[in-house]
């Protein structure tokens, strides 16, 4: 009796000259819907959790544009009818997990029946010598509720600042076409 992943998709820009975050997210969402055998109109909530967009665009909300592009219940829903609510969730690396938590709660309460989470990131366009080059990527997941499976049932997060000195992270860089990129 929990939230389950109905389908998932992930893709890269496949060599597009100037990939656009919106188009990558559109493609990931459409692929994910196809994997699940669902229609865009089946989606009750669409959350975009991507961070890096071309030209560092912040407005309008990318989720609303993706909703429009894939055709998920456009316009105002009729009174008592079905619609899709969409919004951007900017929570860094935790964005997708936070989106799962939000949609799981709404699935558990019966407010939504199918949730979609998309994320796409492209280089925001601040290329200069030594800049990190992001590989344009996108992903999408569809969440539903299943009475037979445990799925996602509880979420809990906690931070322990007294242990922050135990965390270490790093990247190995290499030169490629005049830019430093992660190996």
Report residues per predicted region.
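Short beta-strand segments
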Residues: 115-121
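Conserved "HGTGT" condensation-loop signature of ketosynthase/thiolase-family condensing enzymes
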Residues: 1-51, 55-58, 64-75, 145-183
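A generic local secondary-structure boundary/capping motif
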Residues: 104-106, 127-132
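Extended hydrophobic secondary-structure segments that form protein cores and membrane-embedded regions
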Residues: 46-48, 85-90, 118
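Short beta-strand scaffold segments in enzyme catalytic cores
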Residues: 138-143
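Hydrophobic alpha-helical segments and helix pairs
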Residues: 120, 131-134
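Short-chain dehydrogenase/reductase
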Residues: 22, 93, 132
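Conserved catalytic cysteine-centered active-site region
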Residues: 53-113
